[in-house]
């Protein structure tokens, strides 16, 4: 598109430095791309650029690292990091919280990638029958029938839909209680929408509460909660659902799918674009304030959705600051080391300790 400016430096080299852009470019945040039905908003444009860039840098991600230049400063002791975290919360005018899989895992939703007690509690019969070593493994299995596939998918969806609000989320809520904030998440497990109204959360990877047409014949999504409950009840101790309960598109009759990235032909229609509009509008309204970008539990599968946009935006907004909490990595780009904090520790412990420090 003529005149479009990149948000980041996309020069091909082993380690990428975050690049500043002029503020006029930042605020001109709606781009129209040919052959698209919807305008591309600020945050989605940033994700698209970072995702496209990442294709040539997969070796760094596969090894558990990042291609960005990182700070080489020695981290402060844990207690000091907690004090700094609390201080940065208090000093910020507003907070954009980005929650990923590590946040839910820290509160007991740790059945996705591990064959542990939580996984066995909810998926034991499938582990015994198929040998899965985590919930995600079953999500990509080549099921022999639709009835078998939905026996598993219904169990998976039911597990997240009926999970209680996990403690790290309650602690985060207390930390944010006195702030102007917005939540961006790649989690599909509905934890955030159990806590906050729809307009305060952007679920850019989908939501387990909805079905879509597997053929994307329609832009519509529809309720999955009641059909999932019916399938689980009918299945009982078995592994398959009755044929008549296999969910189908009410428009074309094709098999339905959960409205989430990763299960198939993810519908990127009006509901999807609404998520990006919400976070982009929030950024547009707050960009000249002291924004704290708070990243929680981002892994190496999808860094271009929360982590790398937060890095780029912190670098681009002169009053912004950044905090990351992760139990496996401690990534802080050199470009934002003077305005950033990276804590490598259990997310549940960190949020509980920050809440205590703030007296909330």
Model-derived regions: residue spans:
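Cationic, low-complexity basic patches in intrinsically disordered or flexible, solvent-exposed regions
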Residues: 5, 14, 20
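Short terminal hydrophobic/aromatic SLiMs and anchors at protein ends
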Residues: 5, 10-11, 27, 33
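Alpha-helical interaction segments
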Residues: 16-17, 33
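Conserved catalytic alpha/beta core of Sir2/sirtuin-type deacylases, generalized to analogous enzyme cores
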Residues: 22, 26-360
């Amino acid at each position: 598109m003529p005149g479009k400016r990149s948000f980041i430096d996309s020069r091909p080299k082993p380690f990428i430095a975050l690049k500043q852009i002029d503020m006029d470019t930042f605020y001109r945040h709606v781009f129209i791309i040919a052959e698209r039905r919807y305008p591309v908003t600020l945050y989605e444009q940033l994700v698209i650029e970072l995702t496209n860039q990442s294709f040539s840098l997969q070796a760094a991600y596969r090894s558990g690292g990042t291609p960005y230049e990182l700070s080489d400063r020695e981290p402060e002791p844990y207690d000091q990091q907690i004090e700094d975290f609390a201080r940065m919360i208090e000093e910020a005018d507003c907070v954009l919280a980005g929650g990923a899989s590590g946040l839910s895992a820290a509160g007991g939703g740790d059945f996705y990638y591990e064959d542990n007690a939580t996984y066995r509690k909810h998926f034991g019969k499938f582990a015994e029958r198929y040998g899965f070593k985590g919930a995600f493994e079953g999500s990509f299995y080549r099921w022999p029938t639709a009835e078998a596939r939905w026996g598993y998918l219904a169990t998976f969806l039911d597990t997240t839909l009926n999970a209680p609000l996990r403690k790290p989320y309650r602690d985060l809520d207390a930390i944010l209680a006195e702030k102007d904030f917005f939540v961006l998440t790649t989690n599909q497990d509905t934890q955030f929408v159990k806590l906050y109204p729809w307009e305060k959360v952007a679920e850019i990877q989908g939501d387990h509460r909805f079905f879509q047409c597997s053929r994307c014949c329609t832009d519509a999504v529809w309720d999955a909660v009641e059909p999932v409950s019916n399938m689980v009840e009918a299945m009982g101790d078995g592994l398959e659902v009755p044929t008549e309960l296999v969910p189908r598109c009410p428009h074309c009759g094709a098999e339905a799918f959960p409205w989430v990235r990763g299960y198939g032909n993810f519908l990127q229609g009006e509901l999807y674009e609404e998520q990006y509009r919400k976070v982009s509008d929030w950024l547009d309204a707050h960009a000249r304030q002291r924004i704290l970008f708070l990243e929680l539990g981002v892994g190496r599968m999808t860094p271009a959705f929360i982590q790398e946009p937060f890095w780029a935006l912190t670098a681009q907004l002169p009053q912004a600051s950044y905090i990351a909490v992760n139990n496996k990595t401690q990534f802080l780009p050199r470009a934002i080391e003077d305005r950033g904090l990276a804590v490598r520790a259990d997310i549940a412990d960190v949020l509980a300790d920050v809440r205590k420090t703030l007296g909330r």
